[in-house]
Amino acid sequence: MGKMILVTGGARSGKSAFAEKLARESGGEVVYIATAEAWDAEMEHRIALHRNRRPSDWQTYEAPREAAEVIREAGQEHGTILFDCVTIYLSNLLCREAEPYDEAKLAALVQGEMASLIEAVQGLPEETTVLFVTNEVGAGIVPENRLARLYRDLAGLANQQLAAAADAVYAVLCGIPLRIK
């Protein structure tokens, strides 16, 4: 069974940089699973920042959806997988759904997808480590629209599910990682 580490924090908290540091320190081959899609210039810039920080020898997979299969395949040959990030992946899932949003259906969809990611990690060799990066979106103000509130709630549930299954959990605040599990 592979090892699972969850790294959470707010926007620009340093969580990705910390997860990248853990991946580099692993000493083995690293696979980077990118979940973001560039829909506008600002997102293109964010993706470029992440891409420029990564070592050139890391293998990158673009997986905006159906990432469990990518984890299964990559984890058989590589010692460390960095999945960045869960909350972007979650937004990709939600964007596929049509309005009106059925909260129970979306909760089941998210729970099922998180279970698939967890099962993929559990099926890996024990020497494989998967680092999941996620955003802590529930610590701010209550969003003004229904979809944003639903996203916040589903992200919180997804993070809880991943944290419960993780071997270690880090919260990154102001660039400082704190191990909370």
PLM segments and residue spans:
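Residues at the starts of beta-strands that form the adenosine-phosphate
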Residues: 28-31, 79, 129, 168
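Charged, low-complexity C-terminal accessory regions
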Residues: 1-15, 23, 29, 160-181
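Structured helix-beta-strand junction loops
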Residues: 26, 56-57, 77, 124-127, ...
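A basic- and aromatic-enriched beta-loop-alpha substructure that forms the phosphate/nucleotide-
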Residues: 80-94
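Conserved P-loop
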Residues: 5-75
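Catalytic phosphate/metal-binding cores of nucleic-acid and nucleotide-processing enzymes, i.e., regions
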Residues: 1-2, 76-77, 108
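Residue-level signal for inorganic ion chemistry
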Residues: 19, 50, 82, 135, ...
